């Protein structure tokens, strides 16, 4: 009996070790943002809307990332960096404009903010599903806001488990400057 427990413990430790030493690559995003993803992931740049697109080989999962540097106009024709609250409001409006059918509603998703490496930020995430070409797609859209900067990360897949597993990569996001 003790041998079975020991074997199970070794198997569990082996799985954890394999995950923790997964080879990762730091990908640069516009405006000083970075994200770490597995080294074998493919990076593309959408030529139309300039999104960064990341996906693993042989998977339905896609991550689309957009970065914005946003200023707020003042009455005296000057401008200041947009506040975190202004950016949060803009992100909320953009996500809530996503057209969902069948009276579906966006649901706010809570993440553990203690796991982030970013200072002075706000995070909002929403999860939803929709149909594209008669195929159900599950998505989580996250906005990370710091003063003057908004990073939007969208996770998409036909498989809900893939998206929920990939959300862990958001904790590797850093703002360099």
Q: Where are the regions that the model predicts?
A:
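Surface-exposed amphipathic alpha-helical segments
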Residues: 41, 147-177
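Bacterial Sec-dependent signal peptides at the C-terminal "C-region" and cleavage site
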Residues: 14-22
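Solvent-exposed loop/turn segments connecting transmembrane beta-strands
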Residues: 46, 133-136, 159-164
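N-terminal "mature-domain start" segment
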Residues: 21-51
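A short, solvent-exposed beta-edge/loop patch
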Residues: 139-149
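Sec-dependent N-terminal signal peptides
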Residues: 4-14
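Conserved polar/disulfide-associated segments of primarily extracytoplasmic proteins
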Residues: 48-140
